[in-house]
C-alpha cells in the first residue's frame, strides 16, 4: 500500500472521531503516528514529539474506494489526467480508484493497462485500471482480456456503451471467468 504523503515528523491527531467500518463503531480518540505508522490510539495522548493536528469532531476513517472514475488519460488530458484525478481523489479521502476505459484511445490492451499503471506508479493513491470488454469499445470483438489482467486490469467494462452482439458479450463473459473476473 502506498503512503498518501510523506511527513518527516511524527504526528498526533487529537480529538478525532474514529470510525471503524469493520467493527461499525465510532469513538473519540487521539492517534499517534511515528515514522508514518500508527503507534497508538487512545484518549489524551501527550507528546512534544512532532506535529499536533486538532481534529475536533472530525471523522477519521480508512481510505475510501471509488469503483467508477473517469480520469480521461490517454487522449483527453484537457479534461483530466491520471495525476490530477489522483490528487483530487486523495483530497476527498480516496486511497483507491478504479478508472474506466473510455479514453481516447480506449484502455483495451495490455499496453494501455501498463501505460496507466506506469503513470500512476509515483502517485499517492492506488489506481486500478478497468479494461475495455471490446476493442475500441465498438462491441464487435473482445479485447485482450487475459493480457490486460496479466498486466494489472481488475475488471472489464465498455462503460456506458452496450455490447449489442449477444455472442460477443457471452464469449467475453465466459472467457473472463478464466481470469477470475465475475
For each feature predicted by the language model, list its residue ranges.
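Metal-associated gating/positioning segment near the N- to mid-region
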Residues: 58-120
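Hydrophobic/aromatic beta-strand patches that form the interior of the parallel beta-sheet core
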Residues: 13, 51-53, 65, 98, ...
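Histidine/acidic-residue-rich, glycine-tolerant segments that coordinate divalent metal ions
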Residues: 103-115, 119-182
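Divalent metal-coordination and catalytic microenvironments
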Residues: 16, 31, 36, 57, ...
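Active-site metal-binding motif and surrounding structural segment of the metallo-beta-lactamase
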Residues: 44-61
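N-terminal metal-binding scaffold of metallo-dependent hydrolase/deaminase domains
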Residues: 1-47
Amino acid at each position: 500500500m502506498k503512503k498518501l504523503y510523506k511527513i518527516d515528523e511524527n504526528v498526533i491527531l487529537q480529538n478525532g472521531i474514529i470510525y471503524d467500518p469493520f467493527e461499525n463503531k465510532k469513538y473519540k480518540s487521539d492517534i499517534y503516528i511515528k515514522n508514518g505508522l500508527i503507534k497508538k490510539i487512545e484518549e489524551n495522548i501527550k507528546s512534544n514529539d512532532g506535529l499536533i493536528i486538532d481534529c475536533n469532531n472530525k471523522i477519521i476513517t480508512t481510505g475510501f474506494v471509488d469503483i467508477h472514475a473517469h480520469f480521461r488519460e490517454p487522449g483527453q488530458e484537457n479534461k483530466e489526467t491520471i495525476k490530477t484525478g489522483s490528487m483530487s481523489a486523495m483530497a476527498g479521502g480516496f486511497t483507491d480508484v478504479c478508472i474506466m476505459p473510455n479514453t481516447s484511445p480506449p484502455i483495451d490492451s495490455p499496453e494501455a493497462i501498463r501505460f496507466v499503471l506506469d503513470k500512476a506508479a509515483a502517485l499517492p493513491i492506488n489506481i486500478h485500471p478497468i479494461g475495455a470488454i471490446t476493442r475500441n469499445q465498438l462491441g464487435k470483438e473482445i479485447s485482450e482480456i487475459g493480457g490486460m489482467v496479466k498486466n494489472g486490469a481488475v475488471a472489464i467494462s465498455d462503460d456506458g456503451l452496450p455490447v449489442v452482439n449477444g455472442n460477443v458479450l457471452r464469449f467475453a463473459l465466459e472467457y473472463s471467468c478464466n481470469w477470475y473476473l465475475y
